[in-house]
Amino acid sequence: MKKISILGSTGSIGKQTLDVVRDNRDKFEIVAISANSNIELLLEQIVEFKPKYVTVFEENKALKLKEMLPKNIEIEVLAGMEGLKIISSLDEVDVLLTAVVGMIGLVPTLCAIKKGIDIALANKETLVTAGELVMKEAEKYNVNILPVDSEHSAIFQCLNGENKKNIEKIILTASGGPFRGKKKGELVNITKNEALKHPNWSMGRKISIDSSTLMNKGLEVIEARWLFGVEQENIDVVVHPQSIIHSMVQYTDSSIIAQLGCPDMRLPIQYALTYPDRMESSFERMNFSKFSTLTFEEPDLETFPCLKLAYECLKMGGTYSSVLNSANEVLVSEFLEDKIGFYDIPYYIEKTLEVHSSISEPTLEEILETDRWSRAYVANLIKK
């Protein structure tokens, strides 16, 4: 039985992870869970899955959760970053699933790696901001980094049993988001509610906005570079509106291996939790007669400049990707609060990148300092 700790159990990926566990009680045990502030749902999860530890990032909410707990439930309630670090490095945990949004996942992930705990990674910002550092640590401590993103899970599976020296290119597929086919002039006054309507996937608010700007795909390009050790010029993005092919690998002999399946995040979650094995599931099976046509097109970098910015940051190296990520987090939050427009997101990111003095091969402290600088700088830009 695998023992699991989940960072972000009340979010979209966290809830779907618990769906997988719920259907396979004999295979998995939940040791610890965490949330930012949604203690009502967290309490329901505690009652159902009976973890030994829970962390609430907002300390006042952690105190409130303690008051809400039924007297017959024994659980250690922790708070803040310290709490996340503790539940990420418990001796009894086999797999840490990181499903928190943003930079908050980096330090706990490194804590888990140093304890030799395998990582089921749904928090792409960890590799975007500190990919080189994280992968070196994973190699040092002999830890598996198991991707939960559908695209990276697909590539991971396509590489199984293959020699990485034979990779010619990685091909990440993108749905194109809710605005595929639109031009810039049509998107200037777009609202958050329109941007949140993803055509194929059930996702959280932040990642839904990232999908609408194609920043999500840009972050995935950076993540793929570190996860699979492939240079950026060998990572392509192709828009595939049906989201049936989740990604592909082209080899030096011209062969392409692809991973297909119905759009369901529970599949890559389950694979990450059961790796290197596969486990039966009740997930929907492919009916090829329903998909008589699979289409592909080039991404429109003029309409969706965030993808281009991500490629540029990867090429420049150093801490540029960290600035890209941090600025984007701030700007997406502002957009979701109706404080800025859709195209303010790439505009302010570019302005922040222009003044950044990059650090090559940054330490953890330098990455965290870059994150703080970027957030403060872009917040100040918006105020002006």
Swiss-Prot record:
Keywords: Isoprene biosynthesis, Manganese, Metal-binding, NADP, Oxidoreductase. Pfam families: DXP_redisom_C, DXP_reductoisom, DXPR_C. Pathway: Isoprenoid biosynthesis; isopentenyl diphosphate biosynthesis via DXP pathway; isopentenyl diphosphate from 1-deoxy-D-xylulose 5-phosphate: step 1/6. SUPFAM superfamilies: 1-deoxy-D-xylulose-5-phosphate reductoisomerase, C-terminal domain (SSF69055), Glyceraldehyde-3-phosphate dehydrogenase-like, C-terminal domain (SSF55347), NAD(P)-binding Rossmann-fold domains (SSF51735). The keyword Manganese applies. 1-deoxy-D-xylulose 5-phosphate binds at residues 124, 150-151, 175, 198, 211, 216-217, 220. One of its GO terms (molecular function) is NADPH binding. Mn(2+) binds at residues 149, 151, 220. NADPH binds at residues 10-13, 38, 123, 125, 204. Its EC number is 1.1.1.267. HAMAP family: DXP_reductoisom. Belongs to the DXR family. This is 1-deoxy-D-xylulose 5-phosphate reductoisomerase. The lineage of its organism: Bacteria, Bacillati, Bacillota, Clostridia, Peptostreptococcales.
